[in-house]
């Protein structure tokens, strides 16, 4: 846990040592290095890394039909081979680079760079240069630490986050291009084309209040909807069958508080809502998805991340409203983010199946490249 706490304070200290215009670069570099050199950190790390060691897979094509896939799998059954065949095309490109250079750790570095690069570019566009935004990104359970596990999806999420500039500037072709690229990292991103059209709805705050209340009573309708063979979603039905653990339940209550907090602040300051309308709507819609789909395994939480990430665009304005209305000091926000981090690490350390974060380990300190985070019970 010490390493994670060290990084938290390092983000603060180094950001304060330099002028504000360097904040995004500093935080990007710190989190990139911390992510890129990790070993066996992240729930799915072992799967990603194991595939990256299969240098002989370089011979396989990026584009392969379903029948060819089944034929190859029948000839040589390997879990990693199946994963390669079914993953999205741009992920295969990254793996081929790693295999060509015979560097398994490179794939971790490439994913880490892409995720944080597009987050940084999005913040640069909006001229958001506050280290507290990065602290929130680092400490909030659904963001940075999830990106250490679901790397493919988080590249897609970060690209969608970056595409917000094209929504604001009404550049639909560039937005569509971003969605297409994101979808080639994770197919669920194709569904995010809806963001562009939501921006034209001009939703009132009352609609967000309505969504908050019905999110607790949508189970029956959504259950029938998810059981249909909907485009893209049908590929991820397995997540509907996967139960949410203790950590997911804690995040559930955090999301409720987050949604309520955004609504309250929106009513306290009309200018706040008007200036950040699209980002607020997307974030609240993400909260709605998380709350409404909490009983359906991991599908809801994972889809909600595409939307909730937009909170980074108005986090500093939220702080300004709270300072103005309630005279809350800056250190209170930092304390809350620190407590979120401690809570996250505590839950992870005591996970009933396997810790994904604790302890932190760098790849150059693990000479034999052995996975140490063993399963405590049947996963």
Predicted regions located by residue number:
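Membrane-interface transmembrane helices that cradle and orient dolichyl/undecaprenyl
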Residues: 160-173
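Start-transfer (signal-anchor) and selected internal transmembrane alpha helices
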Residues: 1-31
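Membrane-embedded helix bundles of polyisoprenyl
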Residues: 132-150, 154-161, 188
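Short hydrophobic/aromatic helix or loop-helix immediately within or flanking a transmembrane segment
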Residues: 46, 50-54, 64-100
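Transmembrane-helix signature of polytopic, membrane-embedded enzymes
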Residues: 22-26, 123-140
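Signature aromatic-anchored transmembrane alpha helix within multi-pass, membrane-resident enzymes
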Residues: 210, 323-344
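Alpha-helical transmembrane segments and terminal signal-anchor/GPI-anchor hydrophobic tails
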Residues: 41, 46-50, 55-64, 84, ...
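Transmembrane-helix motifs of polytopic, lipid-linked glycan transferases
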Residues: 109-126
